[in-house]
């Protein structure tokens, strides 16, 4: 592994930890994503964070995701994450399930294997964190009862 890849892996591990230390399962291979998505129950809800090393992921996407996923009255059955730019195959496989234009960071909410909500980077970057959290809260309240 070259110095750049080693550095990025170290940084990404800390950023991944912001989610995994709060109950998110990190899916790091294509196989893990496929296995997870193919075994999820039809009535389960899954909140997916497509993580990134960018500033809007650090200052907005991860904090909003953790706050709402851990504190909202209505919460998804499962919370998972893939890391764009780090776990490339896992992210590509998750994006096949999402069926939206690739975007990171971003959020997806599934009911079973059906996408019921998606927030791309353009609705995260430059917004107030409270507005992002309220959008997630509304999606959870509607779909995670």
From Swiss-Prot:
InterPro entries: BrxB/BrxA (IPR009474)
Gene3D superfamilies named among the record's database cross-references: Glutaredoxin
BP terms from Gene Ontology: cell redox homeostasis
Pfam families for the chain: Disulph_isomer (PF06491)
Source superkingdom: Bacteria
Family membership: Belongs to the bacilliredoxin family.
Protein's name according to its UniProt entry: Bacilliredoxin SAR1441
Organism this protein belongs to: Staphylococcus aureus (strain MRSA252)
